[in-house]
Protein backbone atom coordinates (compact mmCIF):
# COMPACT_ATOMS: atom_id res chain seq x y z
CA UNK A 1 0.00 0.00 0.00
CA UNK A 2 1.04 3.60 -0.62
CA UNK A 3 2.17 5.44 2.52
CA UNK A 4 2.80 8.64 0.56
CA UNK A 5 -0.78 8.63 -0.74
CA UNK A 6 -2.14 8.65 2.81
CA UNK A 7 0.41 11.14 4.16
CA UNK A 8 -0.03 13.70 1.39
CA UNK A 9 -3.83 13.71 1.76
CA UNK A 10 -3.60 13.86 5.55
CA UNK A 11 -1.33 16.90 5.42
CA UNK A 12 -3.48 18.56 2.77
CA UNK A 13 -6.84 18.11 4.49
CA UNK A 14 -5.81 18.77 8.07
CA UNK A 15 -3.31 21.15 9.68
CA UNK A 16 -0.10 20.10 7.97
CA UNK A 17 1.11 17.98 10.88
CA UNK A 18 1.66 14.25 10.52
CA UNK A 19 0.27 11.43 12.64
CA UNK A 20 0.72 7.68 12.98
CA UNK A 21 -0.01 5.38 10.06
CA UNK A 22 -1.80 2.07 10.60
CA UNK A 23 -2.75 -0.75 8.24
CA UNK A 24 -5.25 -3.61 8.52
CA UNK A 25 -5.67 -6.26 5.83
CA UNK A 26 -8.55 -7.88 4.05
CA UNK A 27 -8.68 -11.66 4.06
CA UNK A 28 -9.19 -14.82 2.09
CA UNK A 29 -10.60 -18.10 3.39
CA UNK A 30 -8.74 -20.99 1.80
CA UNK A 31 -11.26 -23.63 2.86
CA UNK A 32 -14.02 -24.05 5.43
CA UNK A 33 -17.17 -22.55 3.90
CA UNK A 34 -20.61 -22.36 5.54
CA UNK A 35 -19.03 -24.00 8.58
CA UNK A 36 -19.02 -21.05 10.98
CA UNK A 37 -22.70 -21.25 11.98
CA UNK A 38 -22.38 -25.04 12.14
CA UNK A 39 -19.68 -24.86 14.80
CA UNK A 40 -16.94 -26.01 12.45
CA UNK A 41 -13.56 -24.69 11.35
CA UNK A 42 -12.66 -21.83 9.04
CA UNK A 43 -9.19 -21.34 7.58
CA UNK A 44 -8.54 -17.68 6.74
CA UNK A 45 -5.43 -15.64 6.15
CA UNK A 46 -4.73 -11.92 5.96
CA UNK A 47 -3.76 -10.59 2.52
CA UNK A 48 -1.60 -7.80 1.10
CA UNK A 49 -4.60 -5.59 0.37
CA UNK A 50 -6.42 -3.63 3.03
CA UNK A 51 -7.07 -0.26 4.66
CA UNK A 52 -4.35 2.26 5.52
CA UNK A 53 -5.05 5.26 7.74
CA UNK A 54 -3.09 8.18 9.13
CA UNK A 55 -4.48 9.30 12.49
CA UNK A 56 -3.55 12.00 15.01
CA UNK A 57 -5.35 13.20 18.16
CA UNK A 58 -6.60 16.78 17.67
CA UNK A 59 -7.16 17.90 21.27
CA UNK A 60 -10.93 18.27 20.89
CA UNK A 61 -13.98 16.01 21.24
CA UNK A 62 -14.56 15.98 17.47
CA UNK A 63 -13.57 13.19 15.08
CA UNK A 64 -12.66 14.57 11.66
CA UNK A 65 -12.49 11.99 8.85
CA UNK A 66 -11.44 12.15 5.23
CA UNK A 67 -12.07 9.22 2.87
CA UNK A 68 -9.45 9.43 0.14
CA UNK A 69 -11.32 6.99 -2.11
CA UNK A 70 -14.68 8.76 -1.83
CA UNK A 71 -13.21 12.29 -1.58
CA UNK A 72 -15.66 12.82 1.26
CA UNK A 73 -15.24 14.49 4.64
CA UNK A 74 -17.31 13.79 7.77
CA UNK A 75 -17.17 15.11 11.33
CA UNK A 76 -18.90 13.89 14.49
CA UNK A 77 -18.61 14.34 18.24
CA UNK A 78 -17.14 11.33 20.04
CA UNK A 79 -20.11 11.17 22.43
CA UNK A 80 -22.81 11.98 19.87
CA UNK A 81 -25.63 9.49 20.61
CA UNK A 82 -26.77 9.46 16.97
CA UNK A 83 -23.53 9.43 15.03
CA UNK A 84 -22.96 10.40 11.40
CA UNK A 85 -25.38 9.61 8.59
CA UNK A 86 -22.73 8.75 6.00
CA UNK A 87 -22.67 4.96 5.82
CA UNK A 88 -18.87 4.68 5.59
CA UNK A 89 -18.35 6.93 8.62
CA UNK A 90 -20.68 4.82 10.76
CA UNK A 91 -18.09 2.03 10.80
CA UNK A 92 -15.60 4.37 12.47
CA UNK A 93 -18.24 5.87 14.76
CA UNK A 94 -19.21 2.36 15.87
CA UNK A 95 -15.60 1.48 16.61
CA UNK A 96 -15.26 4.63 18.73
CA UNK A 97 -18.31 3.60 20.76
CA UNK A 98 -17.15 0.00 21.18
CA UNK A 99 -13.64 1.01 22.21
CA UNK A 100 -15.08 3.40 24.82
CA UNK A 101 -17.21 0.52 26.14
CA UNK A 102 -13.94 -1.39 26.61
CA UNK A 103 -12.55 1.40 28.80
CA UNK A 104 -10.55 3.32 26.19
CA UNK A 105 -10.90 7.10 26.66
CA UNK A 106 -11.34 7.99 23.01
CA UNK A 107 -10.88 11.69 22.27
CA UNK A 108 -11.18 13.66 19.05
CA UNK A 109 -8.81 12.84 16.21
CA UNK A 110 -8.10 13.59 12.56
CA UNK A 111 -7.89 10.67 10.13
CA UNK A 112 -7.42 10.16 6.40
CA UNK A 113 -7.63 6.67 4.93
CA UNK A 114 -7.91 4.68 1.74
CA UNK A 115 -8.28 1.04 0.75
CA UNK A 116 -7.11 -1.26 -2.03
CA UNK A 117 -9.37 -4.19 -1.13
CA UNK A 118 -11.44 -4.85 -4.28
CA UNK A 119 -15.08 -4.15 -3.46
CA UNK A 120 -17.48 -7.03 -4.02
CA UNK A 121 -14.70 -9.61 -4.00
CA UNK A 122 -15.52 -11.06 -0.59
CA UNK A 123 -12.24 -9.92 0.96
CA UNK A 124 -13.91 -8.04 3.81
CA UNK A 125 -13.02 -4.39 3.31
CA UNK A 126 -15.43 -3.40 6.10
CA UNK A 127 -13.68 -5.66 8.63
CA UNK A 128 -10.33 -4.17 7.55
CA UNK A 129 -11.69 -0.65 8.18
CA UNK A 130 -13.02 -1.60 11.61
CA UNK A 131 -9.83 -3.40 12.59
CA UNK A 132 -7.62 -0.53 11.43
CA UNK A 133 -9.39 2.04 13.58
CA UNK A 134 -9.80 -0.30 16.57
CA UNK A 135 -6.06 -1.05 16.50
CA UNK A 136 -5.21 2.65 16.12
CA UNK A 137 -7.48 3.86 18.94
CA UNK A 138 -6.09 1.15 21.22
CA UNK A 139 -2.59 2.45 20.46
CA UNK A 140 -3.35 6.19 20.63
CA UNK A 141 -5.75 6.29 23.58
CA UNK A 142 -5.62 2.89 25.27
CA UNK A 143 -1.92 2.11 25.83
CA UNK A 144 -2.58 -1.07 23.83
CA UNK A 145 -4.34 -2.60 26.84
CA UNK A 146 -7.29 -3.99 24.88
CA UNK A 147 -6.66 -7.58 23.76
CA UNK A 148 -6.59 -8.60 20.12
CA UNK A 149 -9.71 -10.69 20.63
CA UNK A 150 -11.57 -7.68 22.00
CA UNK A 151 -10.43 -5.60 19.02
CA UNK A 152 -11.90 -8.22 16.68
CA UNK A 153 -15.11 -8.41 18.72
CA UNK A 154 -15.40 -4.60 18.64
CA UNK A 155 -15.46 -4.83 14.85
CA UNK A 156 -18.12 -7.53 14.92
CA UNK A 157 -20.22 -5.53 17.40
CA UNK A 158 -19.95 -2.48 15.12
CA UNK A 159 -21.43 -4.49 12.26
CA UNK A 160 -24.26 -5.76 14.46
CA UNK A 161 -25.18 -2.51 16.23
CA UNK A 162 -24.32 0.31 13.84
CA UNK A 163 -24.43 -1.22 10.36
CA UNK A 164 -27.18 -3.81 10.79
CA UNK A 165 -25.19 -6.76 9.48
CA UNK A 166 -25.33 -9.94 11.58
CA UNK A 167 -21.85 -11.17 10.63
CA UNK A 168 -19.69 -13.86 12.19
CA UNK A 169 -16.25 -13.25 13.68
CA UNK A 170 -13.98 -14.68 10.95
CA UNK A 171 -13.38 -11.47 8.98
CA UNK A 172 -12.34 -9.32 11.94
CA UNK A 173 -10.39 -12.21 13.46
CA UNK A 174 -8.33 -12.66 10.30
CA UNK A 175 -7.66 -8.93 9.95
CA UNK A 176 -6.42 -8.60 13.54
CA UNK A 177 -4.58 -11.90 14.05
CA UNK A 178 -3.11 -12.46 10.57
CA UNK A 179 0.57 -13.31 10.14
CA UNK A 180 2.76 -13.20 7.07
CA UNK A 181 3.02 -16.67 5.51
CA UNK A 182 0.49 -18.20 7.92
CA UNK A 183 -3.11 -19.35 7.65
CA UNK A 184 -5.22 -19.73 10.77
CA UNK A 185 -7.53 -22.59 11.66
CA UNK A 186 -10.23 -21.04 13.81
CA UNK A 187 -12.58 -23.23 15.83
CA UNK A 188 -15.90 -21.39 15.59
CA UNK A 189 -17.18 -23.12 18.74
CA UNK A 190 -14.35 -22.45 21.18
CA UNK A 191 -12.57 -19.58 19.36
CA UNK A 192 -9.32 -21.46 19.77
CA UNK A 193 -7.02 -21.09 16.79
CA UNK A 194 -3.74 -22.36 15.41
CA UNK A 195 -1.33 -21.04 12.78
CA UNK A 196 -0.28 -23.19 9.83
CA UNK A 197 2.49 -22.44 7.32
CA UNK A 198 1.46 -21.21 3.88
CA UNK A 199 4.57 -20.65 1.78
CA UNK A 200 3.65 -22.10 -1.61
CA UNK A 201 6.95 -21.84 -3.48
CA UNK A 202 6.19 -22.15 -7.16
CA UNK A 203 2.50 -21.27 -6.76
CA UNK A 204 0.37 -18.14 -6.83
CA UNK A 205 -2.90 -17.59 -5.01
CA UNK A 206 -5.46 -15.53 -6.90
CA UNK A 207 -9.13 -14.62 -6.82
CA UNK A 208 -11.23 -14.57 -9.97
CA UNK A 209 -14.23 -12.29 -9.52
CA UNK A 210 -17.23 -13.19 -11.68
CA UNK A 211 -18.71 -9.74 -10.95
CA UNK A 212 -22.15 -11.31 -10.74
CA UNK A 213 -24.45 -11.61 -7.74
CA UNK A 214 -27.69 -13.53 -8.09
CA UNK A 215 -30.58 -12.31 -5.93
CA UNK A 216 -32.67 -15.34 -5.05
CA UNK A 217 -36.25 -15.46 -3.85
CA UNK A 218 -36.71 -16.24 -0.19
CA UNK A 219 -33.79 -16.58 2.25
CA UNK A 220 -31.34 -19.10 0.77
CA UNK A 221 -28.83 -18.78 3.61
CA UNK A 222 -31.49 -19.19 6.28
CA UNK A 223 -32.90 -22.18 4.39
CA UNK A 224 -29.54 -23.93 4.56
CA UNK A 225 -29.02 -23.06 8.17
CA UNK A 226 -32.47 -24.43 8.96
CA UNK A 227 -31.62 -27.65 7.10
CA UNK A 228 -28.53 -28.14 9.24
CA UNK A 229 -30.41 -27.38 12.45
CA UNK A 230 -33.16 -29.82 11.45
CA UNK A 231 -30.63 -32.62 11.02
CA UNK A 232 -29.09 -31.85 14.42
CA UNK A 233 -32.55 -31.91 16.02
CA UNK A 234 -33.32 -35.35 14.57
CA UNK A 235 -29.94 -36.77 15.62
CA UNK A 236 -30.34 -35.34 19.13
CA UNK A 237 -33.77 -36.99 19.43
CA UNK A 238 -32.19 -40.38 18.71
CA UNK A 239 -29.36 -39.81 21.20
CA UNK A 240 -30.87 -38.09 24.26
CA UNK A 241 -27.85 -39.09 26.35
CA UNK A 242 -25.49 -36.91 24.28
CA UNK A 243 -25.23 -33.16 23.79
CA UNK A 244 -25.79 -31.96 20.22
CA UNK A 245 -25.71 -28.24 19.49
CA UNK A 246 -24.39 -28.06 15.93
CA UNK A 247 -23.39 -30.42 13.13
CA UNK A 248 -19.86 -30.21 14.52
CA UNK A 249 -21.04 -32.57 17.28
CA UNK A 250 -22.43 -35.17 14.86
CA UNK A 251 -20.78 -38.17 13.20
CA UNK A 252 -21.17 -39.66 9.73
CA UNK A 253 -22.93 -42.68 11.22
CA UNK A 254 -25.45 -40.50 13.04
CA UNK A 255 -26.16 -38.57 9.85
CA UNK A 256 -26.91 -41.83 8.03
CA UNK A 257 -29.31 -42.84 10.82
CA UNK A 258 -31.62 -39.91 10.09
CA UNK A 259 -31.28 -39.76 6.30
CA UNK A 260 -34.77 -41.07 5.57
CA UNK A 261 -36.38 -38.87 8.21
CA UNK A 262 -34.85 -35.54 7.17
CA UNK A 263 -35.10 -36.03 3.41
CA UNK A 264 -32.45 -35.83 0.70
CA UNK A 265 -32.14 -32.04 0.59
CA UNK A 266 -31.36 -31.62 4.29
CA UNK A 267 -29.21 -34.75 4.23
CA UNK A 268 -27.11 -33.42 1.33
CA UNK A 269 -26.56 -30.08 3.02
CA UNK A 270 -25.48 -31.72 6.27
CA UNK A 271 -23.29 -34.13 4.28
CA UNK A 272 -21.42 -31.14 2.84
CA UNK A 273 -20.84 -29.60 6.27
CA UNK A 274 -19.43 -32.81 7.77
CA UNK A 275 -17.23 -33.28 4.72
CA UNK A 276 -15.99 -29.71 4.92
CA UNK A 277 -14.90 -30.22 8.52
CA UNK A 278 -12.82 -33.20 7.42
CA UNK A 279 -11.40 -31.28 4.44
CA UNK A 280 -10.19 -28.41 6.62
CA UNK A 281 -8.33 -30.86 8.85
CA UNK A 282 -6.87 -32.62 5.80
CA UNK A 283 -5.62 -29.31 4.38
CA UNK A 284 -3.96 -28.44 7.70
CA UNK A 285 -2.17 -31.79 7.67
CA UNK A 286 -1.13 -31.30 4.03
CA UNK A 287 0.28 -27.82 4.67
CA UNK A 288 2.44 -29.10 7.50
CA UNK A 289 3.92 -31.55 4.97
CA UNK A 290 4.22 -28.93 2.21
CA UNK A 291 1.79 -30.99 0.10
CA UNK A 292 0.06 -28.36 -2.04
CA UNK A 293 -1.34 -30.92 -4.48
CA UNK A 294 -3.55 -32.32 -1.71
CA UNK A 295 -4.52 -28.78 -0.71
CA UNK A 296 -5.67 -28.17 -4.28
CA UNK A 297 -7.57 -31.46 -4.46
CA UNK A 298 -9.50 -30.56 -1.30
CA UNK A 299 -10.35 -27.14 -2.77
CA UNK A 300 -11.90 -28.84 -5.81
CA UNK A 301 -13.82 -31.21 -3.53
CA UNK A 302 -15.18 -28.23 -1.60
CA UNK A 303 -16.35 -26.56 -4.81
CA UNK A 304 -18.15 -29.74 -5.84
CA UNK A 305 -19.85 -29.94 -2.45
CA UNK A 306 -20.87 -26.28 -2.48
CA UNK A 307 -22.27 -26.70 -5.99
CA UNK A 308 -23.98 -30.10 -5.82
CA UNK A 309 -24.69 -30.71 -2.12
CA UNK A 310 -25.07 -27.30 -0.48
CA UNK A 311 -26.28 -25.77 -3.76
CA UNK A 312 -24.87 -22.27 -3.33
CA UNK A 313 -22.99 -22.07 -6.63
CA UNK A 314 -24.21 -20.60 -9.91
CA UNK A 315 -23.50 -21.14 -13.59
CA UNK A 316 -20.74 -18.51 -13.71
CA UNK A 317 -18.83 -19.89 -10.72
CA UNK A 318 -19.07 -23.46 -12.00
CA UNK A 319 -17.77 -22.22 -15.35
CA UNK A 320 -14.77 -20.57 -13.67
CA UNK A 321 -14.08 -23.80 -11.79
CA UNK A 322 -14.26 -25.82 -15.03
CA UNK A 323 -11.85 -23.46 -16.82
CA UNK A 324 -9.44 -23.77 -13.89
CA UNK A 325 -9.51 -27.57 -14.22
CA UNK A 326 -8.99 -27.37 -17.99
CA UNK A 327 -5.88 -25.25 -17.42
CA UNK A 328 -4.37 -27.61 -14.85
CA UNK A 329 -4.89 -25.22 -11.93
CA UNK A 330 -3.94 -27.06 -8.73
CA UNK A 331 -7.01 -26.00 -6.74
CA UNK A 332 -10.10 -23.86 -7.27
CA UNK A 333 -13.33 -23.28 -5.39
CA UNK A 334 -16.06 -20.78 -4.58
CA UNK A 335 -14.99 -18.38 -1.85
CA UNK A 336 -17.73 -16.81 0.22
CA UNK A 337 -21.45 -17.35 0.62
CA UNK A 338 -22.05 -18.25 -3.02
CA UNK A 339 -24.57 -17.29 -5.72
CA UNK A 340 -21.89 -15.10 -7.31
CA UNK A 341 -18.66 -13.45 -6.29
CA UNK A 342 -15.24 -15.08 -6.54
CA UNK A 343 -13.37 -18.30 -6.91
CA UNK A 344 -10.07 -18.71 -5.07
CA UNK A 345 -7.37 -20.47 -7.07
CA UNK A 346 -4.02 -22.08 -6.30
CA UNK A 347 -2.04 -21.85 -9.55
CA UNK A 348 1.46 -23.01 -10.45
CA UNK A 349 3.71 -20.13 -11.49
CA UNK A 350 4.49 -21.62 -14.88
CA UNK A 351 0.83 -21.70 -15.99
CA UNK A 352 -0.41 -18.57 -14.22
CA UNK A 353 -0.21 -16.18 -17.18
CA UNK A 354 -1.85 -18.71 -19.50
CA UNK A 355 -4.64 -19.33 -17.00
CA UNK A 356 -5.32 -15.61 -16.57
CA UNK A 357 -5.44 -15.13 -20.34
CA UNK A 358 -7.64 -18.17 -20.95
CA UNK A 359 -10.15 -17.60 -18.15
CA UNK A 360 -10.49 -13.94 -19.14
CA UNK A 361 -11.10 -14.76 -22.80
CA UNK A 362 -13.52 -17.65 -22.20
CA UNK A 363 -15.54 -15.92 -19.49
CA UNK A 364 -15.82 -12.72 -21.52
CA UNK A 365 -16.93 -14.63 -24.62
CA UNK A 366 -19.62 -16.50 -22.66
CA UNK A 367 -20.95 -13.81 -20.31
CA UNK A 368 -20.17 -10.53 -22.07
CA UNK A 369 -17.89 -9.03 -19.44
CA UNK A 370 -14.39 -9.79 -18.21
CA UNK A 371 -13.78 -11.22 -14.75
CA UNK A 372 -11.45 -9.34 -12.43
CA UNK A 373 -8.37 -11.22 -11.24
CA UNK A 374 -6.48 -10.37 -8.06
CA UNK A 375 -3.26 -12.12 -7.05
CA UNK A 376 -2.92 -12.12 -3.26
CA UNK A 377 -0.10 -12.83 -0.81
CA UNK A 378 -0.68 -14.02 2.77
CA UNK A 379 0.47 -11.09 4.87
CA UNK A 380 0.65 -9.48 8.31
CA UNK A 381 -2.45 -8.57 10.31
CA UNK A 382 -3.28 -5.17 11.81
CA UNK A 383 -0.16 -3.17 12.63
CA UNK A 384 1.38 0.27 13.03
CA UNK A 385 3.32 1.19 9.91
CA UNK A 386 5.08 4.30 11.22
Can you say where each PLM-predicted feature lies in the sequence?
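C-terminal nucleotide
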Residues: 2-27, 52-85, 182-331, 346-386
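Glycine-rich phosphate-binding loop
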Residues: 339
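Short Gly/aromatic-enriched secondary-structure transition segments
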Residues: 39-46, 224-225
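Short, charge-rich binding segments
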Residues: 44-46, 54-57, 103
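FabD-like malonyl-/acyl-CoA
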Residues: 128, 342-346
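Gly/Ser-rich oxyanion-binding loop with an adjacent helix/lid
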Residues: 1-22, 28, 32, 37, ...
